[in-house]
Amino acid sequence: MAKTLYEKVFDAHVVYEGKNELPILYIDRHLIHEVTSPQAFSGLKMAKRRMARADLTLATIDHDVSTKSVDLNACSDMAKEQITTLMQNTKEFGVRLLGLGDKNQGIVHIVGPELGFTLPGVTLVCGDSHTATHGAFGALAFGIGTSEVEHVMATQTLKQAKLKTMKIECKGQFQKGVYTKDLILYLIAQYGTAKGTGYAIEFCGELIRNLSMEARMTLCNMAIEFGAKVGMIAPDEITFEYIKGKEFAPKGEEFQKYCEYWKSLRSDEGAKYDASITLDVSKIKPQISYGTNPSQVIGIDEKIPKISDFKNQSEQKSLLDALYYVNLEQDQVIEGVKIDIVFIGSCTNGRLEDLKIAADILKGRKIHKNVKALIVPGSMQVRKEAENLGLDKIFIEAGCEWRYAGCSMCLGMNDDKANSGQRVASTSNRNFVGRQGKGSITHLMSPASAAACAIEGVICDNRKYLGV
């Protein structure tokens, strides 16, 4: 029977399936961080349990760490407590920790792939909703709750219902100035934040095969904003080359054997999907969010919708509520809206390729005098590689702040926050009410668009800086 990529990986990991019971999956990799792990470790201690496979667990500090310094004292009191607790728990249970000052510390969904901890065909979980990022490698990766974190620690297994499958085929090639961030925002804008609910998505097609691993990770990262639990891309030579030589990756002849197996991790010809979408990506323009959920997105040269554009009353109310919060009007042109802060970073767009894209636009230019721009590498490894290329100098000379690794302004859990009423051009993944600080206003976009906004001080078209 022909199978999809998702079905192949799922079926290969079922260790038990009783009658009228959910299948139990073996979990190959477990990533943890300081926010969702303390309760899980406490549960183990109360039950006097040890971890089943501490060697298959990797911990990092990312959510509430300071990006101004690698010193613990630079963190808030709550952050200090969470970080110290993780340090104690990982030491007690024998889990490797990428702590403050570690050369590999960074955002959980960036350090996993960087170290080769994420591999094709594995099951990978983390107490974080954007775990779908790792599906870019052909891994079955998804976010879990704190009680499930404890269950994986104790048993290295998890009960999981089998999802429906959806194929999203991407035909054509991007226009200049358009990136996978624009693609995923466009997809969510066209179909809504619930279209993927109950599905494992597989991205495929001409465009996908030509994408770098960094670009693929951006795409899978925001599958959750589309409503899907899982986003996957079949591994190929680009995947294998990215993994080769990394710390946790197989070595030598063993690596070649794994590559032969990984080549089988693609949907069979004739495999049936429960749903499918085909996109012509050549029509996509740089996308900008205007509201308070990731489906409220338009092209840079478009106007904000009018209430008459929606027939559904709930959609009409959602539009009015969003526009009231973000202080914008129906039928308003998005280009030219003043911004106060630019944030380039996060597990969506904090990789070296993202920083290169931003630096290409900022090189030899200055940011607007009324703009504060934060450039936050997703890991200390990304930071080092960027500095080796001189990107830090480009950012600093442009007037940006060059920070240490962390989640930073993606969420209001650390000191990097916007004040009430401040408008942020952000490369992160969510534009919810107060996401980047109480009363803050978020406009989601690509690193190229964010860099252009930093220069002009308003939402603008990045393509003017690319000779388009």
Curated annotation (Swiss-Prot):
It is an enzyme of class 4 (lyase). [4Fe-4S] cluster binds at residues 347, 407, 410. The keyword Amino-acid biosynthesis applies. GO terms for biological process: L-leucine biosynthetic process. Its cofactor is [4Fe-4S] cluster. Pathway: Amino-acid biosynthesis; L-leucine biosynthesis; L-leucine from 3-methyl-2-oxobutanoate: step 2/4. NCBIfam families: leuC (TIGR00170), PRK05478.1 (NF004016), PRK12466.1 (NF009116). Belongs to the aconitase/IPM isomerase family. LeuC type 1 subfamily. This is 3-isopropylmalate dehydratase large subunit. The gene is leuC.
